[in-house]
Each structure stands twice: as structure tokens, then as C-alpha cells.
């Protein structure tokens, strides 16, 4: 999955960018205060994308 597609999915579910690290972006779900880091790669493994969504407590993206 492309990183931009995952970020679009995260933003559509109400999460926001908390901060930028050197190699990761950190997102927060304001509904439940869950946090997750998203690596800065062009392609993100589908398993990792599902894991990030699970950490943020949002539905998994469609493949």
C-alpha cells in the first residue's frame, strides 16, 4: 500500500498528526487517545498498515 493512501485513510477517520520524528510520523486518534507511528517509506506492507490501523482503533484499509 502506498504511504499517501494509508495517510488519507487515517485522516478520513479523524486521526491527526501529533509530531514528526526523523524516520516516522506519529498519529493520534482523538476519540480514544490511541497513538501509532507510520514509517516514511513509499510502500508500506499491508500487514503493517493493518497493524497501524489496529493501534489507532480504526477500520483496516481496503486493499
Place the predicted regions along the sequence by residue:
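Charge-dense, helix-prone N-terminal extensions
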Residues: 1-18, 48-55, 61
